[in-house]
Amino acid sequence: MEGISIAKLLIIGALIVLLFGTNKLRSLGGDLGSAIKGFKKAMKDEDTSATRTTAEDVPAERVVHKD
């Protein structure tokens, strides 16, 4: 087996365009782009929240009671 050639990919692409139409493919591409953008934003937010200092990370001050 030699794999998928460029000619086969073009035929598959033409069949997909005929089945779904260009408008449907355009909206599908936009939806996919929005999903990827949202995923990247969520990953960035997770990275910044992991680097924030929490109260547990900061050493507490020593309190001395005078009797």
UniProtKB/Swiss-Prot annotation:
Lipid bilayer topology: Single-pass membrane protein
PANTHER family: SEC-INDEPENDENT PROTEIN TRANSLOCASE PROTEIN TATA, SEC-INDEPENDENT PROTEIN TRANSLOCASE PROTEIN TATE
MF terms in GO: protein transmembrane transporter activity
Its job: Part of the twin-arginine translocation (Tat) system that transports large folded proteins containing a characteristic twin-arginine motif in their signal peptide across membranes. TatE shares overlapping functions with TatA.
Chief place where the protein resides: membrane
Transmembrane segments: 1-21
GO CC, one annotated term: TAT protein transport complex
GO biological process: protein transport by the Tat complex
Signal sequence extent: none
Keyword Membrane set for record: yes
Keywords recorded for this protein, A-Z: Cell inner membrane, Cell membrane, Membrane, Protein transport, Translocation, Transmembrane, Transmembrane helix, Transport
Keyword Coiled coil: no
Subcellular location as annotated: Cell inner membrane
Region Disordered, annotated ranges: 46-67
Family membership: Belongs to the TatA/E family. TatE subfamily.
Name listed for the protein in its UniProt record: Probable Sec-independent protein translocase protein TatE
